[in-house]
Amino acid sequence: MRRKILCLIFVLKIRCKFYKTIFQLYQYYNKINAKLQSIKDKQKIERTTLRQKRITRKRNNRINDYLSKAARTIVNYCLNNDIGKLVLGYNEDFQRNSNIGSINNQNFVNIPYGKLRDKLIYLCKLYGIEFKLQEESYTSKASFFDGDEIPIYDKENLQEYIFSGKRIKRGLYQTSTGKLINADCNGALNILRKSKVVDLRVLYNRGELNTPKRIRVV
């Protein structure tokens, strides 16, 4: 019987390898499509050309291939390490209502989060791994090691929450005692804490929580 837990979080930042790859694919094909669109405009062509359809199909195939490999890598890691539960953080409004600048908003819209989620759900069901989606609001702001209470975001609630720790620079989170932890790990642990799928007291003194392990997908 599997007893270990894997908490998975994909932080939507350019520096994150997974999303950087997706961004690059979209940017490359969008650049080509923009040139084709410019030619169409000059020639007053309104329909989608065969070349546009071809590059769109190629882009979608490449992204789907990458997502499939990413999902397979995650599930294989679970199987190889006797992990029986997978927790995936999500935010229902992270695309619809995000207001973080025009460039970042474009990147958020391009992220095929739902496709990755669906692939993980399918593979987890296939191999008997328990899969749970967990709402993740405030998990990047709260301090895991300080045990901050993590509220659920409500747009009707105007209350401002104060947390023990803070992000002091890109990728690094500082607790109230000055302990430094990788910001992505802090967020992932808070998602796991919010999910309540396991007692996390045994994790507080685990050294590997401070720094994440990077796994190459392709």
Where are these regions (language model features)?
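Positively charged, helix-rich recognition surfaces that bind polyanionic ligands
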Residues: 2-218
